[in-house]
A protein has these predicted regions:
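Conserved short beta-strand elements that form part of the metal-binding/catalytic scaffold
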Residues: 8-13, 44-76, 119-121, 125-133
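Short secondary-structure junctions
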Residues: 43-49, 101-106
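Short secondary-structure boundary/hinge segments and terminal tails
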Residues: 56-57, 112-114, 141
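General secondary-structure edge motif
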Residues: 17-18, 71, 75, 102-103
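Solvent-exposed, well-ordered amphipathic alpha-helical segments
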Residues: 30-35, 46, 50, 58-66, ...
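N-terminal beta-strand motif that seeds the catalytic metal site of vicinal oxygen chelate
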Residues: 10-48, 76-83, 129-141
């Protein structure tokens, strides 16, 4: 099975490799750098040497030293993942302090959301979203 961009999509039974919602297989140039990022920066739960749970998503990391880093957020395929928070400014600052790359500082999208972006060591973007329909409040903080 493929998504509209041609990426392989695999449906797995609930609980397979601890996946209960979404599992994302990611190639990384350095498993050591990715492990530091997931463990220390995101403070994700380590399931094994190359598998992490962050909220309801399980990331399955595969080391490939030849993997090209992400250089553009626009294009086909996976470009970023999103995490919902109550205070984007605080979450963004915390992730940057822990080692994430500051990709886009927090800003407000009308009355819909306050968002920002950070990046991992391979340049994969993470959207930090304070969505009004979920948090009720878009004030900075």
């Amino acid at each position: 099975m493929q998504d509209p961009d041609g990426n392989a999509v695999t449906l797995v039974p609930r609980g397979y490799l601890d996946i209960t919602h979404i599992g994302m297989r990611m190639r990384v140039r350095s498993l050591a750098a990715a492990t530091r990022f997931f463990s220390e920066t995101l403070q994700a739960v380590r399931l094994d040497a190359a598998r992490y749970r962050w909220a309801t998503t399980v990331f399955l990391l595969e080391e490939d030293p030849e993997h090209e880093p992400v250089t553009d957020m626009q294009g086909k395929g996976y470009r970023y993942t999103t995490v919902q928070v109550y205070k984007v400014d605080t979450a963004h600052a915390t992730l940057v302090e822990r080692g994430a790359t500051d990709a886009v500082s927090p800003f407000t999208l009308g009355s819909t959301a306050r968002i920002s972006f950070v990046a991992d060591p391979d340049g994969n973007w993470i959207e930090i979203s304070q969505r009004a329909s979920l948090t009720g409040d878009l004030s900075p903080g």
